[in-house]
């Protein structure tokens, strides 16, 4: 059967990435979902990250986001902090332990990206990213 439908190919690529990434991340006691949350926290923690921010960014349900954060908290990688601007709101932030691991985890992300796109030239990789962003309506971001 010829695979010529973009939705099927994108899903297969996602599953292949998760298979490769989970094998690599096992050494760090992280799942792909936990890694993605850590990556987001590294990038956005200065702006204050709430559970709802994770839900929106990754299109995940509230229970899923809560579960991932709770597991990261048990591993000592994230903590909740009070929001000084809103008494009923809390932020999620990387712990000192997580900040120490940041360079290694970010490098790991680059390695995973390279592994997934190793059959593409640099120009093809850029085109792929551009097309995926366009498909998702993220061209200007």
Go through the PLM ranges and name each one.
Residues 1-28, 75:
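N-terminal leader segment of winged-helix/HTH proteins
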Residues 10-13, 17-20, 58, 101-117, ...:
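Alpha-helical linker/hinge and terminal dimerization helices associated
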Residues 70-129:
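Charged, amphipathic alpha-helical coiled-coil/dimerization segments
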């Amino acid at each position: 059967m010829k695979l010529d439908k973009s939705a099927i190919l994108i899903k297969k690529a996602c599953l292949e990435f998760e298979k490769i990434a989970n094998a690599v991340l096992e050494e760090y006691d992280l799942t792909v979902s936990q890694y993605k949350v850590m990556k987001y926290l590294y990038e956005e923690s200065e702006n204050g990250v709430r559970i709802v921010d994770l839900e929106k960014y990754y299109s995940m349900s509230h229970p899923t986001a809560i579960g991932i954060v709770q597991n990261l908290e048990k591993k000592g990688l994230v903590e909740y902090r009070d929001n000084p601007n809103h008494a009923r709101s809390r932020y999620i932030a990387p712990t000192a332990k997580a900040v120490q691991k940041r360079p290694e985890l970010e490098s790991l992300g680059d390695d995973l990206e390279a592994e997934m796109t190793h059959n593409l030239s640099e120009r093809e990789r850029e085109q792929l990213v551009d097309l995926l962003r366009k498909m998702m309506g993220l061209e200007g971001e």
